[in-house]
């Protein structure tokens, strides 16, 4: 054991043994601490609402992986996976541990990530804030008892000090905020941000390194299972309908965001859900609304003096959130795992109005679209966006995947082949013209298409190959107008459709160039018109 490792272990032990380090508090005890410390307010729904301050989302430019000899050759370094040297990390780590040692109170949670016993990650989470500790308790997998928690010897430790601000010139960071992952020291170090989602996504990034090393696929997707045991996975970026479409009263939820896929099937990495809360209503999303009760956390929502919550008010952020244990939802699988998937749905919101509402993909096309991770940024969603812009996020979650994208794509291709999985590309965006001209595809029609795909009714249906993209489109789907199935038919100006489609194809091709020679085999067989 090196001197540094010995020192940090001693400091961690010292923090854990402090009389004012509260270990494995109950939800009620954490509520009392949150309210006593003025960290949040109680809402009429029973949930507490907390503010994350100026950081209302993740800080991807402030996230680093420590460049360590045993790990550095595996990481796909670049703008997303940024390196920081070990010496710089250790200096900052010790500063944070010394800072936390001076705090009057700390909060400690022990639990797990990964509902598969063979690959379960044992966790210790050390928090400066009580509401962050409740977040960890809600989002990670909880031990059955406090006694079980005391026996957990962690594989990874999260050290979260949101009120510690880094000095970039001294500490080697880019700003006051930092999220640093060290595989050698088995630590996620977080400071300078109160956005609790950094803890959840930090562990997800760790699992996205560790699982593929054991030939286990890790995925940014939601998952559910039908009455007959049929499993469906939903991949998609923000605004594509992933949460809405996977919340189905006739199917049980496995998980809403992070999963692994091993030799036994699919398993949830988490023990909770982190749902978007903007414009939430009981009518539109009853499962999520009903889950926001005692024990849940709301982030950055607007709460009136009487405790009522205005979910439509975005004065603090569009990214309001609700974090709650998965057992706040009635319709779940216990434990959170199931058999191999029968169906995979890739969701995209095409604001150009040219991608078919649903198409069946072969394995090569599936790998191509998985690597592309396409959706659209719409006018108004970001400053300066006045026209729809294509947005590509590798593996439908580029910020969370440390290895080269082909590692995940190749694993996916092998699993699709091995288990004969049906893969569909579903466009929840526009039809009959681009955003501003055409109209959004009806949610009713999208649900019908997804339900038909998941039920297996489209497996052996009749398909036609569209001349523009080379995608296989169902000739007909029950209760869905034929006119929208092939997008060119919904456009009054066919030449405009062809020009818009060709423009999008070129953008896909340009995006794919970033992967280099490693993906030539996928581009050759899986791209449009192939």
Curated annotation (Swiss-Prot):
Pathway as given in its UniProt record: Carbohydrate biosynthesis; gluconeogenesis
Keywords from the UniProt entry: ATP-binding, Cytoplasm, Decarboxylase, Gluconeogenesis, Lyase, Manganese, Metal-binding, Nucleotide-binding
UniProt-listed Gene3D superfamilies: 3.90.228.20, Phosphoenolpyruvate Carboxykinase, domain 1, Phosphoenolpyruvate Carboxykinase, domain 2
Any single Gene Ontology cellular-component annotation: cytosol
Record GO terms (molecular function): ATP binding; metal ion binding; phosphoenolpyruvate carboxykinase (ATP) activity
Catalytic activity: oxaloacetate + ATP = phosphoenolpyruvate + ADP + CO2
EC number: 4.1.1.49
Cofactor detail note: Binds 1 Mn(2+) ion per subunit.
Domain of life: Bacteria
Protein residues bound to Mn(2+): 201, 220, 257
Localization terms from the record: Cytoplasm
GO biological process annotation, one example: gluconeogenesis
Binding of ATP, residues: 201, 220, 236-244, 285, 321, 440-441, 446
Pfam assignment, any one: PEPCK_ATP
InterPro entries reported in the protein's UniProt record: PEP_carboxykinase_ATP, PEP_carboxykinase_C, PEP_carboxykinase_N, PEPCK_ATP_CS
Requisite cofactors: Mn(2+)
Positions of substrate binding: 58, 195, 201, 321
Family: Belongs to the phosphoenolpyruvate carboxykinase (ATP) family.
Function: Involved in the gluconeogenesis. Catalyzes the conversion of oxaloacetate (OAA) to phosphoenolpyruvate (PEP) through direct phosphoryl transfer between the nucleoside triphosphate and OAA.
PANTHER family (alphabetical): PHOSPHOENOLPYRUVATE CARBOXYKINASE (ATP), PHOSPHOENOLPYRUVATE CARBOXYKINASE ATP
The protein's name in its UniProt record: Phosphoenolpyruvate carboxykinase (ATP)
Organism per entry: Staphylococcus aureus (strain NCTC 8325 / PS 47)
Name of the gene this protein is made from: pckA
């Amino acid at each position: 054991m090196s001197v540094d490792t010995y020192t940090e272990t001693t400091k961690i032990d010292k923090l854990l043994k402090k009389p004012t380090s509260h270990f494995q508090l109950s939800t009620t005890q954490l509520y009392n601490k949150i309210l006593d410390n003025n960290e949040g307010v109680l809402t009429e729904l029973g949930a507490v609402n907390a503010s994350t301050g100026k950081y209302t989302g993740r800080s991807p430019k402030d996230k680093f992986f420590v460049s360590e000899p045993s790990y550095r050759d595996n990481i796909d370094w670049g703008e997303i996976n940024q390196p920081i040297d070990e010496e710089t990390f250790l200096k900052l780590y010790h500063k944070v541990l010394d800072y936390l040692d001076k705090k009057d109170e700390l909060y400690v949670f022990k639990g797990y990530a990964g509902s598969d016993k063979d690959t379960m990650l044992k966790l210790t989470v050390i928090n400066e804030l009580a509401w962050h500790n409740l977040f960890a308790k809600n989002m990670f997998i909880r031990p059955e008892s406090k006694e079980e928690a005391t026996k957990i010897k962690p594989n990874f430790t999260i050290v979260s000090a949101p009120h510690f601000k880094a000095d970039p010139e001294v500490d080697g960071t880019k700003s006051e905020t930092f999220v640093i992952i060290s595989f050698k020291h088995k630590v996620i170090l977080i400071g300078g941000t109160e956005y609790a989602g950094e803890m959840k996504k930090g562990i997800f990034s760790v699992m996205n390194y560790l699982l593929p090393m054991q030939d286990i696929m890790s995925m940014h997707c939601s998952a559910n299972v039908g009455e007959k045991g049929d499993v469906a996975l939903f991949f998609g970026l923000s605004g594509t309908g992933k949460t809405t479409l996977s919340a189905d009263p006739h199917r049980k939820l496995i998980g809403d965001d992070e999963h692994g896929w091993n030799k036994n099937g699919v398993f949830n990495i988490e023990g909770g859900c982190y749902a978007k809360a903007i414009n939430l209503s009981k009518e539109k999303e009853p499962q999520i609304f009903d889950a926001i009760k005692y024990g849940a956390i709301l982030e950055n929502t607007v709460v009136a003096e009487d405790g009522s919550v205005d979910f439509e008010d975005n004065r603090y952020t569009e990214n309001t959130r609700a974090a709650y244990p998965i057992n706040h939802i009635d319709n779940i699988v216990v434990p959170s795992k199931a058999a191999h998937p029968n169906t995979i749905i890739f969701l995209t919101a095409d604001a150009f109005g040219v991608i078919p509402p649903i198409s069946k993909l072969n394995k090569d096309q599936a790998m191509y679209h998985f690597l592309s991770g396409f959706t659209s940024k719409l006018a108004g969603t970001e400053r300066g966006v006045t026209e729809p812009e294509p947005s590509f996020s590798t593996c439908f979650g580029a910020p969370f995947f440390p290895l080269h994208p082909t590692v995940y794509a190749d694993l996916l291709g092998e699993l699709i082949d091995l288990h004969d999985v049906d893969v569909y590309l579903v466009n929840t965006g526009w039809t009959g013209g681009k955003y501003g001209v055409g109209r959004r595809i009806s949610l009713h029609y999208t649900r019908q298409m997804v339900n038909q795909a998941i039920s297996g009714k489209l497996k052996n249906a009749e398909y036609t190959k569209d001349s523009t993209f080379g995608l296989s489109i169902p000739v007909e789907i029950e209760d869905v107008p034929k006119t929208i199935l092939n997008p060119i038919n919904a456009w009054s100006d066919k030449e405009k459709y062809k020009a818009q489609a060709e423009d999008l194809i070129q953008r896909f091709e340009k995006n794919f160039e970033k992967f280099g020679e490693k993906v030539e085999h996928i581009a050759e067989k899986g791209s449009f018109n192939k």
